[in-house]
């Protein structure tokens, strides 16, 4: 019979914890690129040094959360259990094999009560700036999209509520341009629905809409997923660069449309980086987004969108526009004149009924019961026309094709490798903090791995070419 190895579970040994962690372990790479002095300085006012019992090292608490997000552990409770038995995790925290790990409730309390609300944003920005200082970012083209995160709420526990319809960011500017056109047409200006001190210069709305509100987590929103499935969710509206680094994120309820939350993400990223191209999917193809990006000197890259009108009858492109006379001409030569502009920014063109009554194609052009054809186009339609011409260029096609390699890859990694399919947190503030830390960990992982590869290449290059002494070093 084989001489099997004896049980060594109770064998006392003397071991060096440093030797047990592989040299190429991810946490070693992260420890090499991270600095924590700024965290001690930032959090020093939140700890008392001359009263009470000694507190837990705040950097250790932050490292525990980073471990959770780096390795896709679903909860802090499970993270606490994993750290207890994982040698590499203990090494990263600076704890020995027999040291007690801080309880997960201590970590949760620190982020909810003790640490400042903006700490997670500062950690995210610090890691992003470190990547920027090492020339790893390429924000010349950014990619914006949103992904849903399943909320910790029972979809069967809800109530219907009437809530005020939120005013759009551009409502004030749109109202002013609409009134300018209406005055030229001899029409009465549209009055504001709200007070004159509206932050966007007027244009708020007193309209109310019915929404499904969760009684478990009122901050989330009902997301319709497919034809039959509905669930409460949050949405992370995210922007990344060409190399997959996450540049900004805005978390909203799951029933907020992508184009509504776009402004905050766009303004945040473009205020920090020199952006030339902005690539987005069809959900962002609106007149306002096209106008704002073009007015800012950026090039929007948007996809083809299928015509959603009736398949029977004339299509919008069958009507020819004359910019000098500001009229549309139907396929039978009848002019449709600009009669008014409504509060939504739609220019309304109408034909003359006496000419259309006897037209043989009256039913084909979808004229109304008065025998009059009504044609509408947006006041900012020319910006959408420019976007459409950009879409057809080789550069536009090339940049849009990179979405699957950038923003879609970010969401895939976040859900598959970093446990972002659902959240245990409740409340918009808590979920926002959770998402920012997760994206900070993803940026940190990419930063550490790329820095490690660069250092290995530099070491090999120096050994092969001794005369080369100015090897690139990591910038802190």
Give the role of each language-model region:
Residues 18-22, 31, 35, 71, ...:
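Amphipathic alpha-helical interaction elements
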Residues 89-93:
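Short amphipathic alpha-helical interface patches used for protein-protein assembly/oligomerization
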Residues 3-6, 72-85, 96-476:
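Anion-binding and metal-coordination hotspots
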Residues 23-66, 71-72:
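Basic, short loop/linker segments at the boundary and entry of helix-turn-helix/winged-helix-like folds
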